[in-house]
Amino acid sequence: MRSPGGILLQALPRLLQHAALPGLAELPARWALPRGAGGDGPADRLPRGGGASAAAAAAAASGALLGAYLERHGPPEASELPEPGGALAGGPGSGGGGVVVGVAEVRNWRCCCLGSTCWCRSLVLVCVLAALCFASLALVRRYLHHLLLWVESLDSLLGVLLFVVGFIVVSFPCGWGYIVLNVAAGYLYGFVLGMGLMMVGVLIGTFIAHVVCKRLLTAWVAARIQSSEKLSAVIRVVEGGSGLKVVALARLTPIPFGLQNAVFSITDLSLPNYLMASSVGLLPTQLLNSYLGTTLRTMEDVIAEQSVSGYFVFCLQIIISIGLMFYVVHRAQVELNAAIVACEMELKSSLVKGNQPNTSGSSFYNKRTLTFSGGGINVV
């Protein structure tokens, strides 16, 4: 990354050239000389010749500024200087836009902590999710307390049926509350029984949502997917040779559970393979959510605020669970993006060679048009 000093050295001569000195095209090249190569001071590196008094004053001011910078920081590195004849030097191909490039570089200079791969973002996101979880619990704890007490007072079979109905509802595109049901199942029935209830309920809900969306909502889902580049990319990869792997990885991403069921319903994956891949992909988050539910221990300790130590352990376990879940989701996103890129390259190579891409006979794929935009493949 270029330092602010190097960027200043690049932008200053061009700014002066546009402001007062139209004949300073060779200025950056002369400044690029090391100390002592073209003279003993910055004044020897300035162009000699005529010019108005205002131009001479501007040149003297720029030379003094550069001399002070060089005396304090030393000569700039070669990587910080413009290429001979480049955009900032006003050479061929500059097109008069050198100053715009320099100013853009100055504006775009920022701390590396704002990068997408910085661990600071992960830490901040984990803290925000934990705070939202605690805030939600504080806001709805009274209603949640009564609801959990009511479910716990029901007959065991009736409670299980209620959870299954809940999983069926959240399996549709407009449903919400999948994670809440997972945590509630682990809280009420424990880790083992809660896991079993989750797996059975999710399997039934996924099956029903898949069949209903495939037979009744295909046109609606296809219209929504065509407006989303991310979902279209997932569909393209699913219709390739690694469809089951992509289904399993997509289950670990933040894409809503019901929306994923609708997206996968318009593909040509066989129903048994689809259900198996979905079950495998959902297993890690189900384990984490069930464990998170069991850490609530009892309603009296956490909801009624009767145990300070219980709150401390609960907060620590929630932070660890959310951090682990974030790591799993991040790794799944990396793998899914890699699979999407590989599929894009395969499709692009097939189109360049004049071959028909492998679409597994998908009817949805035949309704779309592949176009080249910016060197990539977009779905329109």
From Swiss-Prot:
Quote the InterPro entries the UniProt record gives: TVP38/TMEM64, VTT_dom
Q: Where is this region: VTT domain?
A: 186-296
Q: Write the record's keywords in alphabetical order, separated by commas.
A: Endoplasmic reticulum, Membrane, Transmembrane, Transmembrane helix
The organism's place on the tree of life at top rank: Eukaryota
What Pfam families does UniProt report for this protein, alphabetically? VTT_dom
Q: Which PANTHER family match?
A: TRANSMEMBRANE PROTEIN 64 (PTHR46593:SF1)
Q: What is known of its domains?
A: The VTT domain was previously called the SNARE-assoc domain. As there is no evidence that this domain associates with SNARE proteins, it was renamed as VMP1, TMEM41, and TVP38 (VTT) domain.
Q: What is this protein called?
A: Transmembrane protein 64
Organism of derivation: Homo sapiens (Human)
According to the entry, what is the taxonomic lineage of the organism?
A: Eukaryota, Metazoa, Chordata, Craniata, Vertebrata
